Regions:
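Short linear regulatory motifs enriched in tryptophan with gly/pro/ser
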Residues: 1-155
């Protein structure tokens, strides 16, 4: 009977360890970003953690294309500018804010949405969630692959 009690304790310890490890796991999104009008010659692949916000996603996208972050933007979940299904960088009233985590948005593999940046120049970036992986801890956003370039302010 004593051996059985020890094995139960051992099972409980294993389960507690497993649950603690699961608690420390989080989703990491791999995304492919294309600027509109550039075809398939210009894109970026980025990885970003589920606890990052849409604001942080915008920052890494702009950084990856060497853009200066100095304008308002919105994430268009239906790929249309000024849509009611958008998260705003500077919301008015009860509009949804881009200060929401990626997990709260509820992204899924294969989902496409857009970043509309600079409402005067109307930069559009198509974002595709290409992969969702489980990782341990929160990783910083990073640029995994870059192809081609564009200029924010062409001559």
């Amino acid at each position: 009977m004593e051996a059985f009690a020890r094995s139960e304790r051992s099972f409980e310890e294993v389960m507690r360890f497993y649950l603690e490890m699961r608690w420390m796991m989080s989703n990491q999104y791999t995304m492919k970003i294309y600027p509109a009008g550039s075809g398939r010659d210009v894109y970026r692949n980025i990885e970003i953690c589920c606890n990052s916000t849409l604001n942080q996603l915008c920052q890494i996208i702009l950084e990856s294309f060497d853009f200066i972050d100095e304008h308002m933007y919105e994430f268009c979940m239906d790929n249309r500018m000024y849509s009611e299904y958008a998260y705003q960088s500077d919301p008015e009233g009860d509009e949804p804010s881009a200060d929401i985590t990626l997990d709260e948005v509820g992204l899924c593999k294969g989902q496409k949405f857009a970043l509309h940046y600079d409402f005067m120049d109307d930069w559009m970036f198509t974002i595709t969630v290409s992969k969702i992986s489980e990782v341990q801890g929160d990783l910083k956003p990073c640029i995994v692959k870059a192809k081609g370039s564009i200029q924010q302010y062409p001559d």
